[in-house]
């Protein structure tokens, strides 16, 4: 926590310098704090559930490196494994025993997975999975959902229209309309909209991709029957069902969202946690589909650093820790304590607020509920969220600098951390 007056002079200086060196001063847009009308604090180190910035401020953090740090930052067992691995080399560009071990671990954890291909990021995973779906089906169209972010590949940078379901338009300059013309969109949790798309294109859809629990519009939870309905529709139309579990994989349960909800997709995209904090991604699924990937099949995909030995080392150790008894019960309990406490604090202070949570993912929305899709989430009071974010930061609590990003719990958090956070929130919310 902040032990003296909140100072950010060094962060301010570094951000001014960074803006002359990198676009916007950052290497991923959300880090710039633009959506909360502020400047970022520059981090010096991380340990457990805490971050320290260059000005000496300590924070309880609920970003977990945007998901990967579920066992806590600098976990001693992960660090020890990496120290042992480093002298053996940082990259080989050749097969390793570690890749076999990591692949087997993923296959054993997720019932729908029979084969795995490792890549370097979530974007690579989703991009490759959609290419594979098209190769397997011989079709071109894909369906995605409004508010679901699947990385920055051109075909996925699509803004949904206001109708029941519309053809996508480019969501970023530089993306040709022709690239997104085959991308169809529907509101999350709207099964009727998906049915309408399949009625319009009954034999044209190669793949349907979604975050089973959305994290990039804030935390959006699937309603009863939604995922089941998607599984039935994709089966009926010969469409590949793809779960983007880059965020939810190994977080909502050891087998991910699909194990928690009992729905088996055809392909699964992974990342974040499976690298233990190092860059990694993977796409995985049924053997008959994965056998299409080169060199076993004709669908080409490659990567210089794919299966990097350090990422495999950190991922193997992280998943080993997550398999221990009581892990997910602890995450569930801590997350419920925080989410319930924040919502109660907001309502006690008279604010319109809604809390969404599944497992170790949560969001406090500054709007009346329910929040079941991206349109609902966009009704949130963003100015109020920005003031709340700043007030919490000044009190030593580091939240995601966007209303539309889920928060994350780690095994390193304590009940004392949660109680401090809720108490800080009460103070901030009372003054908004």
From Swiss-Prot:
SUPFAM superfamilies: PLP-dependent transferases. Gene3D superfamilies: Aspartate Aminotransferase, domain 1 (3.90.1150.10), Type I PLP-dependent aspartate aminotransferase-like (Major domain) (3.40.640.10). It is an enzyme of class 5 (isomerase). GO terms for cellular component: cytoplasm. GO terms for molecular function: glutamate-1-semialdehyde 2,1-aminomutase activity; pyridoxal phosphate binding; transaminase activity. CDD domains: OAT_like. It comes from the Bacteria. Keywords: Chlorophyll biosynthesis, Cytoplasm, Isomerase, Porphyrin biosynthesis, Pyridoxal phosphate. It catalyses: (S)-4-amino-5-oxopentanoate = 5-aminolevulinate. It is found in: Cytoplasm. Pathway: Porphyrin-containing compound metabolism; protoporphyrin-IX biosynthesis; 5-aminolevulinate from L-glutamyl-tRNA(Glu): step 2/2; Porphyrin-containing compound metabolism; chlorophyll biosynthesis. InterPro entries: 4pyrrol_synth_GluAld_NH2Trfase, Aminotrans_3, Aminotrans_3_PPA_site, PyrdxlP-dep_Trfase, PyrdxlP-dep_Trfase_major, PyrdxlP-dep_Trfase_small. Its EC number is 5.4.3.8. The modification N6-(pyridoxal phosphate)lysine is found at residue 272. One of its GO terms (biological process) is chlorophyll biosynthetic process. Its cofactor is pyridoxal 5'-phosphate. NCBIfam families: hemL, PRK00062.1. Belongs to the class-III pyridoxal-phosphate-dependent aminotransferase family. HemL subfamily. Homodimer. This is Glutamate-1-semialdehyde 2,1-aminomutase. It comes from Gloeobacter violaceus (strain ATCC 29082 / PCC 7421).
